């Protein structure tokens, strides 16, 4: 919301500002625009599913910035329904889903920033939720760290110096950039849409599967970094090449999705569309 407040100044300067062009947010929002353009007259529900089926072999580590990751999963969850936000206790809504090329995983409802934009930009949408998968070992470690105060963002005094517990914890955990050579398995990230097309109910699932070891062989990084970095490059390319040219500040769902979707296939993140997928209750 704070970044959107500078939209007018970008318009006056004739500059295109692009927010959130990783995978989620980023690609998932482009998936929504693509579904709206090609598959639906009305989108009624969106479920964003982020599954990491990878294994790095450590007892506990995070796949991206530990401070951001642990804050995200320890915060209250929320989703958009019937025109307003519904807030829930952290990790209190759990579902199981069988992900293509990964298998069945437990996933939990979290707040995620792309919901804020999609709720405004997808006309008539009734519900938007975001789910992310976590294993039981990860959740047990996280709960223990929370119980002893290491997830706190409140500074404390230690040996005469001010430290933030979660920032201290970040220094103790494995650096996510070192996980590439030891991480095996795949990610599966996508969106399930339901709605109406030509007067009939329709549901589709648009998703990408990415292999950790294939990513490492290509760029010496695991799939979490790959699925974040490639979309950032594509978003930049869209703006630099003039394919996305609209002075102001926008999210990725506010542009024509077609060239971005074509670029995903070209640059290592091919996607699939499945009709009538298993829905999340």
Give the residues covered by each predicted segment.
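Rossmann-fold dehydrogenase core element
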Residues: 7-22, 42-43
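C-terminal catalytic/substrate-binding lobe primarily of soluble NAD(P)-dependent oxidoreductases
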Residues: 38-281
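Short alpha-helices
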Residues: 21-31, 36, 231-235
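Short low-complexity, flexible loop/linker segments enriched in glycine and/or proline
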Residues: 7-12, 33-35, 144-145
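Short, conserved acidic/polar surface loops in the N-terminal third of protein domains
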Residues: 7, 29-31, 58-59
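Short, small-residue-biased leader/transition segments that mark boundaries at the very start
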Residues: 2-6
């Amino acid at each position: 919301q704070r970044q959107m407040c500078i939209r007018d100044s970008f318009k006056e300067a004739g500059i295109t500002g692009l927010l959130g062009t990783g995978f989620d947010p980023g690609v998932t929002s482009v998936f929504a625009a693509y579904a709206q353009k090609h598959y639906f007259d009305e989108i009624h529900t969106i479920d964003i599913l982020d599954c990491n089926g990878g294994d790095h072999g450590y007892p506990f580590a995070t796949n991206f910035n530990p401070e951001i990751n642990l804050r995200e999963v320890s915060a209250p969850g929320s989703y958009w329904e019937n025109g307003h936000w519904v807030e829930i206790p952290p990790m209190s809504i759990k579902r199981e889903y069988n992900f293509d090329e990964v298998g069945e995983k437990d996933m939990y409802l979290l707040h995620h920033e792309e919901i804020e934009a999609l709720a405004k930009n997808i006309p008539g949408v009734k519900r938007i939720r975001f789910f992310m998968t976590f294993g039981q070992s990860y959740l047990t470690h996280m709960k223990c760290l929370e119980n002893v105060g290491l997830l706190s963002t409140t500074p404390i005094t230690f040996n005469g110096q001010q430290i933030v517990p979660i920032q201290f914890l970040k220094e103790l955990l494995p650096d996510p950039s070192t996980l590439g050579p030891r991480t095996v398995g795949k990610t599966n990230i996508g969106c399930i849409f339901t709605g109406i097309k030509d007067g009939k109910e329709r549901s589709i699932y648009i998703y990408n599967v990415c292999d950790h070891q294939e990513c490492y062989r290509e760029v010496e990084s695991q799939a979490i970094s790959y699925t974040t970095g490639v979309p950032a490059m594509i978003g930049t390319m869209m703006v630099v090449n003039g394919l996305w040219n609209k002075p102001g500040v926008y999210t990725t769902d506010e542009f024509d999705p077609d060239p971005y979707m074509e670029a995903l296939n070209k640059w290592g993140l091919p996607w699939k569309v499945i009709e009538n997928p298993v829905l999340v209750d």
